């Protein structure tokens, strides 16, 4: 019985492995109609209007739209235009963020093979991979992308690179009866197989479904601002209603008090907050792009500052993603370390930490590994800046090792031409080659798994030698390395390849995917920043533990998570092995359920669902297109150290947003307190609606936005991340807003009462002092600087100066006086107003100098 479901199909009938003719064309066409093409299902298209409506339902955006409506009614068209522009910009950003999810799935199509070689009606044809159906007989060879999930019926020296799906950097051998999964790459050999699964039910389709079903979470900042929007809306309406009631009870006209109350609502809402956020994020994105980190959406920049956990893939992220010989042991027990980068044929040989000349025993081992080998190295070209492997990556690592030992691969192979071979097979797990020497003798070389060589009768070695080499091989394997044993002999007669004898052990070669340069230091920098680094890999637990140990993440006795246990629930687990894409999702979800803000780094197809599920996904620039499309941040230089710098940038941005909130909300609190308390001191109507809106426009506008460009504080990466549960007004910021607002209100009311007693136009004095005092606070909440450091934000000084001139102009220039309802003030009164206005800002600056206050606030008082 054959069943299908959705797009693609799965073969449930037993496959007749003896049929070489494949399907006939008619049957293939019928199955294609029944199951659909062998492609990843496209995401359901969402109408643009739905996406836009989704963005406009955000509480803060709704509050801004209400403010825009109010300012329109009041005739404050400049404010209306600014608010509408901010809403439009944020809506566009949000829609773009949703669209990129569809691109992540579309990228899976680009990973799939564009064409396939299939046998139909007994003839081999080239057909589009999308036309494959279950039951098709497909042939693949080195360099091909497997076009669908295949059940192998033939395989000759077949090795697959499954790293994009599994995260394992070592190629995997496959034999008849086993499966070759869609999207994997044939590195060596050739094979034929019957299609088992296509489209949505193939390995690629399964991951596509995970990506499609994994919706990105809202960022911590978005959650905080949404909560803030709701609170501000309720508080502003309640307090403005109280002002309205007090005025009406006091005999003021209802219409006048209604306009005043609405003006206070506008003043209490920091309508430039989205503009501040957008500017801060845009500047941060530009700085990060200059540091080779490209944010795919603006909120990713700030989210990095909230990160408490970085869940990192191993292959290609913490490691180079390329196989390399790291340690070798010659037949006399001498142990050497080999250095070098990637597959480049340059490096050094070290012993006991010191560089040494290449001894003859090591040279013989390198030569044997080079000769019993089918790989080659490809130099950099116009499209690639690094050396690359041609053939099996593990064998290419042996070629690079030989070159680092001073051997020229082409010259050496020409001097020892291969005349016979016994290819590697999964049963014996070894490869044997025979080479003719210049004196017409025969060099027999054998390489393979240690147990297949050291425990075989082909060796001519003592039991003591074999025991010592076997023990050494186990120790190297425990370090997470893949160990090969090499044996060789120079004989006079052509050997029997099926059962050679008399070979002498030449040594052991330990191959691994080495850590990137500086990876341990990067792990330390995350610890310093209070961010916990986790290692999540598809590799063997021994390999994961070894890499974790080198990074300082794991020690003997620590919990080691794996794909089939519940260690993900253990809060101390920092290393996970044998993880599948679904299990990575579970790990990320478990961390988020504990309140962590998670960044996930990766480069493979298997990382894409987790990249999308995490609070922020970070992809390597050289990784797969699928990973890059699913990520929020792409590291062009593939350097994880860039993430540490980006975390500092994210914290700077969040500090600046809080800095703006302290400034803007304190001004709103001051305005409401002046309107509420003023009548108690004989100031019947402290401010007219037009005056409130003018102060609001000048203080919340350009100066507020300029605060978003403040530089980072000293030591931003030496403090713990803020609590994920902390409100945007948390850590004392709400208290600071009230205290600062009360201080401004006290100064303003004091100046107004004094002016009233002196017979001066007190309402104009209140107007001038309120605006100048808020601008003084803007200067007081700047980022602290080291002694002697230049101020890194001259735009703020210019903005404050310009706004101060416009504020004073409101009582000096006749057209503005008529618009605002103010009276002229003399030079001496204006100087007195300016002097009094300095008090709130000066008090804040003095408070910041108190060591106890500075040490207790961290980012709560980032002013």
Q: What are these language model-derived features?
A:
Residues 723-741, 760-761:
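Membrane-water interface at loop-to-transmembrane-helix junctions
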Residues 215-221, 773-789:
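Membrane-helix boundary/interface segments in integral membrane proteins
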Residues 744-758, 809, 813-818:
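Alpha-helical transmembrane segments and their membrane-interface junctions
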Residues 699, 744, 764-778:
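Generic alpha-helical transmembrane segments
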Residues 679-688, 750-762:
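Helix-coil boundary and interhelical linker segments in multi-pass alpha-helical membrane proteins
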Residues 651-655, 714-728, 779-792, 819-820:
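Alpha-helical transmembrane segments
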Residues 1-695, 699, 703-714, 792-863:
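Conserved cytosolic headpiece of P-type ATPases
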């Amino acid at each position: 019985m054959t069943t299908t479901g959705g797009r693609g199909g799965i073969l449930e009938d037993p496959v007749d492995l003896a049929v070489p003719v494949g399907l006939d064309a008619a049957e293939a066409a019928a199955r294609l109609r029944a199951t659909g093409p062998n492609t990843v299902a496209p995401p359901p298209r969402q109408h643009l209007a739905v996406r836009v409506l989704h963005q406009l339902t955000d509480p803060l955006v709704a509050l801004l739209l209400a403010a825009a409506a109010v300012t329109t009614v009041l005739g404050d068209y400049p404010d209306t235009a600014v608010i509408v522009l901010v809403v439009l910009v944020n809506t566009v950003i949000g829609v773009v963020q949703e669209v990129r999810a569809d691109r992540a799935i579309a990228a899976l199509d680009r990973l799939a093979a564009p064409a396939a070689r299939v046998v139909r009606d007994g003839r081999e044809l080239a057909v589009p991979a999308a036309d494959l159906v279950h039951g098709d007989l497909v042939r693949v060879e080195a360099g091909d992308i497997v076009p669908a999930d295949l059940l192998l019926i033939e395989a000759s020296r077949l090795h697959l690179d499954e790293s994009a799906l599994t995260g394992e950097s070592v190629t995997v051998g496959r034999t008849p009866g086993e499966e070759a999964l869609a999207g994997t790459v044939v590195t060596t050999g050739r094979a034929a197989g019957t299609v088992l699964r296509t489209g949505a039910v193939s390995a690629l389709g399964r991951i596509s479904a995970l990506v499609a079903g994994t919706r990105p979470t809202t960022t911590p900042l978005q959650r905080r601002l949404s909560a803030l929007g709701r609170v501000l809306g309720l508080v502003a309406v309640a307090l403005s209603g109280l002002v309205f009631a007090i005025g009406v009870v006091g005999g003021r006209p209802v219409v006048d008090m209604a306009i005043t109350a609405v003006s206070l609502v506008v003043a209490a809402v920091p309508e430039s907050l989205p503009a501040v956020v957008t500017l801060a994020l845009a500047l941060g994105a530009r700085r990060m792009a200059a540091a080779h980190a490209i944010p795919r959406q603006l909120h990713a920049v700030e989210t990095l500052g909230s990160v408490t956990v970085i869940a990192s893939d191993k292959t290609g992220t913490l490691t180079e993603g390329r196989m390399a010989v790291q340690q070798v042991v010659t037949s006399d027990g001498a142990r050497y370390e080999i250095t070098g980068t990637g597959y480049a044929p340059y490096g050094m040989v070290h012993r006991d930490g010191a560089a040494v000349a290449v001894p003859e025993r090591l040279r013989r081992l390198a030569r044997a590994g080079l000769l019993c080998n089918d790989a080659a190295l490809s130099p950099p070209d116009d499209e690639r800046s690094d050396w690359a492997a041609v053939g099996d990556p593990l064998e290419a690592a042996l070629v690079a090792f030989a070159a680092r030992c001073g051997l020229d691969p082409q010259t050496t192979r020409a001097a020892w031409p291969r005349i016979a071979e016994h290819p590697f097979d999964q049963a014996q797990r070894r490869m044997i080659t025979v080479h003719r020497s210049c004196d017409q003798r025969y060099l027999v070389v054998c390489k393979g798994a240690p147990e297949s060589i050291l425990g075989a009768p082909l060796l001519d070695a003592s039991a003591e030698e074999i025991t010592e080499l076997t023990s050494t091989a186990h120790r190297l394997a425990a370090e997470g390395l893949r160990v090969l044993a090499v044996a060789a002999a120079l004989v006079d007669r052509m050997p029997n390849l099926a059962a050679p004898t008399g070979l002498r052990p030449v040594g052991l070669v330990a191959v691994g995917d080495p850590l990137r340069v500086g990876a341990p230091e990067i792990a330390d920098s995350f610890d310093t920043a209070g961010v916990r680094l986790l290692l999540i890999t598809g590799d063997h637990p021994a390999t994961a533990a070894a890499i974790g140990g080198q990074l300082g993440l794991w020690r003997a006795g620590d919990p080691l998570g794996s794909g089939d246990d519940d260690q993900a629930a253990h809060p101390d687990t920092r290393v996970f092995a044998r993880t599948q894409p679904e299990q990575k999702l579970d790990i990320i979800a478990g961390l988020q359920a504990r309140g962590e803000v998670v960044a996930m780094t990766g480069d493979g197809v298997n990382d894409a669902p987790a990249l999308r599920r995490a609070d922020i996904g970070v992809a390597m620039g050289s990784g797969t297109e699928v990973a890059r499309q699913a990520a929020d941040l792409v590291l062009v230089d593939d350097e994880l150290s860039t993430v540490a710098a980006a975390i500092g940038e994210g914290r700077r941005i969040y500090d600046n947003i809080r800095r703006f909130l302290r400034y803007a909300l304190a001004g709103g609190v001051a305005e409401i307190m002046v309107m509420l308390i003023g009548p108690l001191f004989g100031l019947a109507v402290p401010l007219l609606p037009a005056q409130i809106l003018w102060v609001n426009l000048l203080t919340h506008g350009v100066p507020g936005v300029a605060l978003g460009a403040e530089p980072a504080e000293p030591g931003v990466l030496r403090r713990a991340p803020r609590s994920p549960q902390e409100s945007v007004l948390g850590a004392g910021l709400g208290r600071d807003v009230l205290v600062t607002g009360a201080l401004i209100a006290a100064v303003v009311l004091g100046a107004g009462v004094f002016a009233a007693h002196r017979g001066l136009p007190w309402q104009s004095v209140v107007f001038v002092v309120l605006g100048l005092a808020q601008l003084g606070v803007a200067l007081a909440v700047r980022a602290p600087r080291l002694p002697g450091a230049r101020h890194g934000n001259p735009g703020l000084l210019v903005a404050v100066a310009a706004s101060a001139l416009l504020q004073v102009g409101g009582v000096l220039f006749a057209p503005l006086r008529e618009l605002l309802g103010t009276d002229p003030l003399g030079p001496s009164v204006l100087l007195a107003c300016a002097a009094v206005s300095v008090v709130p800002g000066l008090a804040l600056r003095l408070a910041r100098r108190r060591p106890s206050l500075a040490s207790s606030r961290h980012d709560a008082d980032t002013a």
